[in-house]
Amino acid sequence: MTDRYILAVESSCDETSVAILKNESTLLSNVIASQVESHKRFGGVVPEVASRHHVEVITTCFEDALQEAGISASDLSAVAVTYGPGLVGALLVGLAAAKAFAWANHLPLIPVNHMAGHLMAAREQKPLVYPLIALLVSGGHTELVYVPEPGDYHIIGETRDDAVGEAYDKVGRVMGLTYPAGREIDQLAHKGQDTYHFPRAMITEDHLEFSFSGLKSAFINLHHNAKQKGDELILEDLCASFQAAVLDILLAKTKKALSRYPAKMLVVAGGVAANQGLRDRLTQEITHIEVVIPKLRLCGDNAGMIALAAAIEYDKQHFANMSLNAKPSLAFDQFPDSFVIN
């Protein structure tokens, strides 16, 4: 059987990435050009800065990915690209590059939802078993997704306000931590105790929705009031208390989803899936079903995950024409108008 190679492009936020996937789940390369240092001084991602950085490095990422994989453009079977959700300017850079490369090399173009990429990153670890439930946790999204079969995604719960990763970054900024703050909060939390009381919004309610704005506000108010009064705050305990509240909410809603849907596997993915506290709680508390979490290198934004999701769409011959456009607010159940079903 002839090997299949998919080149994938990811540029939805502040990482420029190009990867090569061989067949179903073998990543030959996954080149990532991070912009974290450029955005640190702003305390968050500046869309215009992100777009300019993508333009500067994306050609080199293509070259490096092919060289690292040891193949040439003539060996490729398809080109995949993230077309949403994300920052519109950033998405357009990746789309333009992917479309130009696909057109120049006479290759089909596969449109991929960024969040489907996060979910399908778990395929590199082991074959997924369906139906499954996915908890997707990142800086821009917090979602519970039911996946009855490959490529069929149904959101069954999502945040009503802040995403969990966004909450981490905002409380991190209040504490004077470096952006992005998730990893540092996790590390500090392991050294502290859950001594401050923070709300667990909607944790006992029957639905599968999340809310983190109240928790974020409670944290900011506590921190502000203590500073005003000159009270001492123990940073490690603050982080431990905040993280305990976050994990209580995530675990409660995930367990509720597992009790309602006929799942054979739980996938936990997205940037926040790198959180060691979350990984520990999941393995300790969810033992009746297999839990699959992507390796750390595939938790953040990367083109490897886009390639892994694209393999599913390739099998279904879900290709797009060159009118494919960026969809910054793309939902899981949306498909591009430019699909060409062969």
From Swiss-Prot:
* EC id: 2.3.1.234
Q: Identify one Pfam family in the record.
A: TsaD
* Residue ranges of the TM segments: none
Provide the cofactor list for this protein.
Fe(2+)
Q: Where does Fe cation bind?
A: 114, 118, 301
Q: Which reaction does it catalyse?
A: L-threonylcarbamoyladenylate + adenosine(37) in tRNA = N(6)-L-threonylcarbamoyladenosine(37) in tRNA + AMP + H(+)
Which UniProt keywords are present, listed alphabetically? Acyltransferase, Cytoplasm, Iron, Metal-binding, Transferase, tRNA processing
Q: Which NCBIfam families match?
A: gcp_kae1, T6A_TsaD_YgjD
UniProt-recorded name of the protein: tRNA N6-adenosine threonylcarbamoyltransferase
Q: Which organism is it from?
A: Streptococcus pyogenes serotype M2 (strain MGAS10270)
